Every structure is written in C-alpha cells, then in structure tokens.
C-alpha cells in the first residue's frame, strides 16, 4: 500500500501529484466530452425529475442537439488546455449525465471516436455513470481499452443509506452500487467513487461510515468528495428557498473532511475534496472563495492539524466487514 506522501507534499494522496508521478512529470489534463446522454432517472426508465439536487436545465434535449461532435469537443478542449495550462497529455473524460446509458456497440463508437483524436498524447479514458447502468458487457468494453490507456469508471455512490437515496430521488439503491463495484472486482478498470456529504438528516457518524464502505473494495482507486450544495433549477433548491436547512460552513466541512480522510484507506487517491457549483447557479452555501482559495484553505487546515490520510484506518476492521 502507498503512503499519503507518495503523491505530493500534502497530507493525502493528491490527484494532480499522482498524475505527475505516473506520467514522468508531464502535465496531464482531463478533456470533457459531452456525448448528449440522458439519465434513466429522468426519461422514465427508472423515474422522472432526476435527483433532487440536480439542475434540471442541464438535461434538456435542446442542449444535446446543439453539441459539437466528440472529435470537435476534444480538439477544442486540447487546444484550450495546451494554451492555458501547457498540458502535454490528456485523459478523455465522458462526464455529463450517464455515459454508459446506451447499447455497448454505440458506446464503443463514441469512446473510439474520443480516443482516436490524438492517440500520441491521450493517456486515459474516464467514464462517468450510474451504478445501475453497468453490466459485464460494458465493463468488458472498458477493459478492452486498458492495453493502450489507463481507464477509470466514475460512479456516484452519493450515500450509503437507502433512506437518503430515496429522499433525493436517486432511483438507485445502495445494493445496486455494491453490485456494480463487485462486477469490476477482477477487471483492470479502476473505480472512482463520488460521494456527497451534508444531507441534513445524516449525522456526523453516519457520514464517517462512508469510509468503511469504500475501504472494503480494493478496486476503488479514486474518490471524489463533495459537500452538498444547493443550485438553482433543482427540486432541492426550490425546497431550500421555501424552508432553508443547515449546510456546512467551510470550517465545519474542513473539520469533517480532516476526520474522514484519516479513516480512508491510505492508498486511495483523492481526485476532489469538495464540490463547487457555478456561481450563477449556486444558492448555498456560499463560502465567498474561489476554487483555488478553498483548496488552499483546506490544505492549510489539514497541515496545521497534522491530519494524515489513513492514520485511523484499521485493516483488521475491513477484514471483519468483508466476511
């Protein structure tokens, strides 16, 4: 197992440092590709309306019809990344909506198009999806790319509690998440898990238990940790406007994240420590900081507190839970 300082001089495994280490110091940048997918929780397959925290406007068919081709998006994204960040290598990131929600042959066509734009400089494929849109055939497709690219599958766990998943209209149970994780167990596809902290009915101790769940699965290589934020155009946003509820302050969230990562397995790489909505959509919480300022604030607090990722992780507990 790696140590927290394997990837950067931080108190946790930092994704940017991980990429630099893996790709010999080269600057690696994710290029987002929007393939115009929808979501089974919106089109009636699993439900309507989507998750209550989602902005409904981001799922309109009109937006999808106006999209440039995958090739055009990636070429433009690479050009911007090189110009603005001097990026040298790229990961093609199918991010918006549910990017395995289609027949496998159609997915192959899209992924192939994305990975063929500039094969000399593309090093990875990242695909965001829901746990209920994964099966053996789709995992086999993703694994077929691992001889040429690093491949990770990003899935929204959001919460480990079915009560929460029901309240937020997730349309997906925690058991479905566990089933998808287990499907990937013996593949070469890395798993990235997305979580949301701060649902008002979940207690501090309930949220800490997310770490125990994540730690059980060695195929989980990456995590994205988000705090709950309320955005315009969401069902939760309308409810919050009528009856505001408690959300994390930045100090409360930093204190919680510090404790959480101390229980997190020390080899896991943290791709993100917090979420950040566009300011024109954000209702709350508004911490009054830019993304880089929030990142710096959290890093400094973690360092000052002497928090180390995995310092409270107990492998023997995982052995008990997995039996």
Residue ranges: model-predicted function:
Residues 1-52, 56-91:
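N-terminal [4Fe-4S]-dependent radical SAM core
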Residues 2-20, 24-29, 229-323:
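Auxiliary Fe-S-binding modules of radical SAM enzymes
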Residues 29-33, 90-92, 125-127, 151-155, ...:
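Hydrophobic faces of well-ordered beta-strands that scaffold small-molecule active sites
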Residues 57-77, 81-104, 117-134, 150-177, ...:
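Core AdoMet radical
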Residues 77-83, 134-148, 179, 208-219, ...:
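Short amphipathic alpha-helices and their capping/turn segments at secondary-structure boundaries
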Residues 81-85, 111-120, 140-150, 182-186, ...:
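Acidic (Asp/Glu)-rich catalytic clusters
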Residues 108-116, 143, 203-221, 250-251, ...:
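Short, electropositive alpha-helical surface patch
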Residues 175-235, 251-274:
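Conserved C-terminal portion of the radical SAM core fold
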């Amino acid at each position: 197992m790696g140590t927290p300082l394997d990837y950067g001089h931080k108190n946790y495994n930092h994704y940017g440092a991980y990429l630099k280490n893996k790709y010999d110091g080269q600057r690696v940048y994710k290029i987002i590709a929007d393939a115009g997918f929808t979501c089974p929780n919106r089109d009636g397959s699993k439900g309507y309306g989507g998750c209550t925290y989602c902005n409904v406007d981001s799922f309109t068919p009109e937006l999808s019809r106006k999209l440039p081709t995958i090739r055009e998006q990636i070429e433009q994204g690479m050009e911007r990344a090189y110009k603005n960040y001097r990026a040298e290598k790229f990961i093609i990131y199918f991010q918006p909506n549910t990017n395995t929600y289609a027949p496998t042959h159609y997915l192959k066509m899209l992924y192939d198009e994305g990975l063929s734009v500039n094969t000399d400089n593309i090093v990875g494929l990242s695909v965001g999806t829901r746990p209920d849109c994964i099966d053996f055939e789709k995992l086999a497709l993703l694994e077929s790319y691992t001889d040429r690219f690093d491949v990770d599958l990003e899935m929204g766990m959001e919460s480990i509690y079915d009560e929460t998943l029901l309240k937020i209209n997730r349309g997906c149970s925690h058991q479905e998440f566990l089933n998808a994780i287990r499907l990937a167990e013996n593949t070469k596809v890395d798993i990235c898990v997305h979580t949301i902290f701060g649902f008002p009915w979940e207690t501090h101790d309930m949220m800490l238990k997310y770490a125990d769940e994540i730690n059980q699965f060695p195929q989980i290589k990456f995590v994205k940790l988000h705090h709950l934020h309320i955005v315009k155009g969401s069902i939760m946003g309308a409810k919050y406007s009528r009856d505001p509820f408690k959300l994390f302050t930045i100090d409360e969230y930093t204190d919680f994240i510090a404790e959480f990562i101390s229980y997190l397995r020390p080899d896991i790489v943290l791709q993100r420590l917090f979420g950040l909505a566009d300011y024109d959509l954000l209702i709350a919480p508004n911490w009054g900081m830019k993304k880089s300022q929030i990142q710096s604030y959290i890093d400094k607090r973690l360092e000052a507190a002497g928090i180390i990722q995995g310092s409270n992780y107990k492998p023997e507990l995982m052995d008990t839970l997995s039996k």
